[in-house]
């Protein structure tokens, strides 16, 4: 009896298959930035500016939340101002009735 050597023949693809790309993802926009304009009248508790970190600092009658959001403490008119040479702040000045 003749013994035959059977080769273990495996065929591989010569092109990678049409798999999914490793891109194609993005995070949701966080809607940061100014929520009230300079000169606008706002009520107490209104959000003035949403931010990460302190791009803008709180001024008169403005508080800073845990996520650095700036909000009005009293009803009044919003003013964006300079704070020194290279910083900005937002203040709320009450209007006389």
From Swiss-Prot:
It comes from the Bacteria. One of its GO terms (molecular function) is structural constituent of ribosome. InterPro entries: Ribosomal_bL27, Ribosomal_bL27_CS. Transmembrane segments: none annotated. Keywords: Ribonucleoprotein, Ribosomal protein. It holds the Pfam family Ribosomal_L27. Residues 14-37 are annotated as: Disordered. GO terms for biological process: translation. The keyword Glycosyltransferase does not apply. Residues 1-12 form a propeptide. GO terms for cellular component: cytosolic large ribosomal subunit. The N-terminus is cleaved by ribosomal processing cysteine protease Prp. Belongs to the bacterial ribosomal protein bL27 family. HAMAP family: Ribosomal_bL27 (MF_00539). This is Large ribosomal subunit protein bL27.
